[in-house]
Amino acid sequence: MSASPSRSPESKPAGNTPPIDVDVENEQNVDAEEAVQPPTPGAGGDDADADDNDAKPAVDNEIDNDNTNLNENEGQNELNEDNLGDSDDESILSEVDEAQFEDFDPENVDIEDRPQLDIDEENLKLIGRHKRKRTEEEGTSKRKKEGRRRKSRRYAEEEEGGSDREAGGKRRKSKKAELEEDEETLDPATRRRRALDRAMDEALKKPTKRRARKQDGIDLEQMADAEIEDMRKRMTHAAQMDAINRREGKPAMHKLKMLPEVVSLLNRNQYVNSLVDPEINLLEAVKFFLEPLDDGSLPAYNIQRDLMTALGKLPINKETLIASGIGKVVVFYTRSKRPEPGIKRMAERLLAEWTRPILQRSDDYSKRVYQEAEFDPTYVLSPFLLKITSRVKSVQDSAAEARARELLPPRLANRARAEISHTSYTVVPKPTVVQESKFARPLGASGEDRFRKMRARQIAATKGQGARR
């Protein structure tokens, strides 16, 4: 697409203008480069400017016809400049005067002559570790003195505060004061947000404090003992009030109301030693809560369940059991048929845990000792003895057995059944296995060796795959 050239009536081509059709493209490239690069001083004179002015009218037609090529060249130049990432306008070398380097002679540069070193093992060891030797003219450079180190904020504030109080000098405004002044000009929402941020920062920076026996002059152990003693008195009074209400036919609700407080106190880990202390004897009040009332009725199921669970977490010893008497109540729950099965199992578990250290028994079943007895085959009745004993039975016994057999539900007669007994065996027969020598391999040793070899192969295969990767 070529646009018609627009000329002013005053512009006329010069008569003596030489033909420049061949060099139009070169001049266009030169003009594009001159548009990007700044002019070099001293490169041309007034004659060159005059020649350019004379050549402009004659070149107008060609330039207008080739505007498309020029735009394409300029776009390509811009892409090249973008790729290079360094324009001539921002370059430092664009401001350098080239005229001052006209008389530069590289042969006359003063370079220090140094003797050439031979390359050997000793010189190679010095590479990267030696220091440049200074000449006498350079002298020794003075080492920079280290400036005054900045103090930490906390020590600086303490020192400034102490010096101000002693000398009465002017205090320097801190950043906190500036922030307070700035916050006065803020809106309420921003102030609330900043206050919340400060509170969260203080909570995160606050170190965790270790629990001490004394805090602000108050003995924490003495305070815990006083709290437990007060709870013991209240529990005893509640048990007495429930017994009175039960005799009068009123509902007994005092122990149920106090149950959450009692369970909360028994579950506090920091009071464990005080809870099982025989002198305070809190477990005696727990016994009053668990024992049956005067009419033989058991306490509420919630009281039994929660207190049994809490007792299982306490380290109760022999002295505590003797002082409190709670072991008698637990034995009653194990032998009575009225408690729920779950409560009964909990009582049996407590009784086993409390009596094991007293009887010096271990809770490890592998170390449990069983009574052993030898098997005597002479006590087994022979068929002849069985016939004699069967004749001795009375007729009434045989009739009763026949009637009981007839009343049984129908079943297959040819089916082998194992008798279910509700008893447990306390005597263990002595083993009759032949004792082998200690050097003999036990049964199943070959299978273990085979499994061990397979495992070793798997491990080796996995390591080989990991090394290949």
UniProtKB/Swiss-Prot annotation:
Q: Where is the composition biased (Low complexity)?
A: 66-78
* SUPFAM superfamilies in UniProt: Conserved domain common to transcription factors TFIIS, elongin A, CRSP70 (SSF47676)
- Which cysteines share a disulfide bond? none
Stretches with biased composition (Basic residues):
142-153
Q: Where in the cell is it found?
A: Nucleus
Has the keyword Transmembrane been applied to this entry?
A: no
Q: What Gene Ontology terms for biological process does this UniProt record contain?
A: poly(A)+ mRNA export from nucleus
What Gene3D superfamilies does the record point to?
A: Conserved domain common to transcription factors TFIIS, elongin A, CRSP70
Listed Acidic residues bias regions: 22-34, 79-110
| Residues of the TFIIS N-terminal domain | 284-361
Instruction: State its role.
Output: Transcription factor involved in RNA polymerase II transcription regulation. May function in both SPT15/TBP post-recruitment and recruitment steps of transcription.
Protein name in the entry: Transcription factor iws1
Organism the protein comes from: Emericella nidulans (strain FGSC A4 / ATCC 38163 / CBS 112.46 / NRRL 194 / M139) (Aspergillus nidulans)
